[in-house]
Regions:
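Internal/C-terminal transmembrane anchor helices
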Residues: 101-128
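Membrane-embedded alpha-helical segments of integral membrane proteins
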Residues: 25-89
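Membrane-interface segments at or immediately adjacent to transmembrane helices
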Residues: 125-194, 219
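Cytoplasmic juxtamembrane regions at transmembrane-helix boundaries
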Residues: 2, 7-11, 85-111
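Auxiliary, metal-adjacent structural segments of Zn-dependent hydrolase domains
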Residues: 168-234, 244
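Pan-zinc metallopeptidase signature
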Residues: 324-390
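Post-HExxH zinc-binding segment in Zn-dependent metallohydrolases
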Residues: 149, 262-309
């Protein structure tokens, strides 16, 4: 009787411990939505750089993606452990000790989940509650005329085609990077640091070693070109096709996540600003290209509404190499998504990302990657109008 009572108490304590862990998991899962903005701001201004130092430093020791290694090796281990678990569970059922065994396994699994959620909150989740880059820059939404919108579009077009003239081409006339992946990763990191200091943006100054993903070709089926892993503070980059129109932006975007920015549109705004401030033609090209292609449909529609004549940019001679780059990029993605399976995987990847963003308070889901077009106009009017390079 005494042994049975002790056993019941032991099981009771295990159940209580499990319930406590479940409670903490729920609470920490709500952090990105509930933590006061002032707390998030204090954390990122004063603590994030120190808290992220250890995992970032560990990740920087490796040139290969730790995230990819864990996904591949972890997937294999999960299959093996699942088989072991089922065999042991059957044995325990026969010996009538299955209940305690299941509770023990559940306890360890919940401990791992809790640790991962805490790491997620510290390295990314809290960042959803801090100020936006737009606010840090002190920008204000203005009411702009068609001519002012066109002025910004012209500025981005001129910057784009000017930078494109200085980029090397392959035999098809398609632009390509002149640097190795590692050299690009180092340059992008220093570029984000430089621009964040210039505009007094509170980002971590830590070195972030971006990682190429070996299985990039298969990863492309999801339509994802970059991913930040908050557990390792690791920027993972798809290298199956080094798209000259977007590769520098992708690098800068993922590095921005690792340096403390959580929102997707913040990372895109910061990345585009960093790229146009670069002295390197490849980065300038990608930054101006991103802004031009974002503004183009908006300004064109504005012209139609106002009855204005909209410039036919795509007929300009300087636009020809840009069009070749665009067509090469489209051809790659058309080939990747040419099968039913790849399109299905793409839809799954997009919906998973959509749910992830919404669960972290980003109501627009994947639409939050889009930077509102007027933010580029606000930035130009505030910082660049009248400048020598504007």
């Amino acid at each position: 009787m005494i042994k049975q009572e002790k056993k019941k108490k032991s099981i009771g304590r295990m159940i209580a411990g499990i319930l406590v862990k479940v409670l903490f998991i729920v609470l920490f899962s709500l952090v990105p939505n509930l933590i006061p903005a002032s707390w998030a701001e204090f954390y990122h201004r004063n603590m994030y750089g120190y808290v992220s130092f250890l995992p970032a430093s560990f990740s920087n020791l490796f040139h290969n993606s730790l995230t990819e290694l864990i996904v591949v090796a972890g997937g294999i281990m999960l299959i093996i452990l699942s088989v072991v678990f089922l065999v042991e569970l059957i044995r325990r059922i026969i010996s009538k000790t299955a209940g305690r065994f299941v509770l023990t396994v559940l306890k360890h699994v919940l401990t791992l989940v809790l640790v991962l959620i805490i790491l997620f909150d510290l390295m990314l989740g809290i960042g959803y509650r801090r100020k936006t880059v737009y606010q840090y820059l002190g920008l204000r939404h203005g009411e702009y005329t068609y001519d002012e919108y066109l002025q910004v579009l012209e500025w981005s077009y001129n910057g784009m085609v000017k930078a494109r003239r200085n980029i090397g081409q392959d035999y098809r006339g398609v632009g390509h990077t002149a640097r190795s992946f590692e050299a690009n990763a180092k340059y992008a990191n220093s570029l984000i640091n430089t621009v964040s200091v210039k505009y007094e943006l509170p980002l971590s100054a830590a070195f972030i070693r971006s990682k190429p993903v070996a299985a990039s070709h298969y990863w492309s089926m999801t339509g994802i070109v970059g991913m930040y892993d908050p557990v390792f503070v690791e920027a993972n980059i798809n290298t199956d096709y080094i798209d000259i129109t977007s590769f520098p932006m992708t690098l800068c975007h993922e590095i921005c996540h690792a340096k403390g920015l959580a929102r997707e549109n913040d990372c895109n705004l910061m990345a585009s600003i960093a790229c146009i401030h670069s002295k390197d033609s490849e980065y300038m090209y990608a930054g101006y290209y991103f802004i031009f292609t974002s503004l183009y449909p908006v300004v064109k529609e504005y012209a139609e509404q106002e009855g204005e004549i909209f410039p036919d940019y795509f007929s300009y001679e300087d636009m020809a190499p840009v069009i070749r780059d665009m067509k090469a990029s489209d051809a790659y993605w058309d080939d990747i998504h040419s099968t039913e399976l790849s399109r299905f995987i793409h839809d799954i990847g997009r919906e998973s990302n959509n749910l992830f963003l919404k669960s972290n308070g980003q109501e627009g889901g994947v639409a939050t990657y889009h930077v509102p077009d007027n933010e580029y106009v606000d930035f130009y009017m505030t910082y660049l109008k009248g400048a020598k390079n504007a």
